Amino acid sequence: ATFSEAPPGNKDVGAKIFKTKCAQCHTVDLGAGHKQGPNLNGLFGRQSGTAASYSYSAANKNKAVIWSEDTLYEYLLNPKKYIPGTKMVFPGLKKPQDRADLIAYLKDSTQ
């Protein structure tokens, strides 16, 4: 399934998902430093493995994917399948609604 087939996302629900599943390793705050994972501010339209001053795996650099609703929707289903060798330990969000909600939050909070 693709993002175009996903249910509408709710950014408020997505914020809760981010807080419980992502915030341990990521921030979305402009100018904030990296945590265990890279700062996600400016994520949309950026190529994987290119946030300044973050030490990425070769897999993330070499994938060279441009982050969009479509690519994030697929990536967040199973990160290790989408980018074999990624350092991200998160197993993914299996429910389409959860992925749509998280993407709605990320679109709102990372620009």
UniProtKB/Swiss-Prot annotation:
Heme c binds at C22, C25, H26, M88. Its main location: mitochondrion. One of its GO terms (molecular function) is metal ion binding. GO terms for biological process: mitochondrial electron transport, cytochrome c to oxygen; mitochondrial electron transport, ubiquinol to cytochrome c. GO terms for cellular component: mitochondrial intermembrane space. Binds 1 heme c group covalently per subunit. The modification N6,N6,N6-trimethyllysine is found at K80, K94. It is found in: Mitochondrion intermembrane space. The modification N-acetylalanine is found at A1. Electron carrier protein. The oxidized form of the cytochrome c heme group can accept an electron from the heme group of the cytochrome c1 subunit of cytochrome reductase. Cytochrome c then transfers this electron to the cytochrome oxidase complex, the final protein carrier in the mitochondrial electron-transport chain. This is Cytochrome c. It comes from Spinacia oleracea.
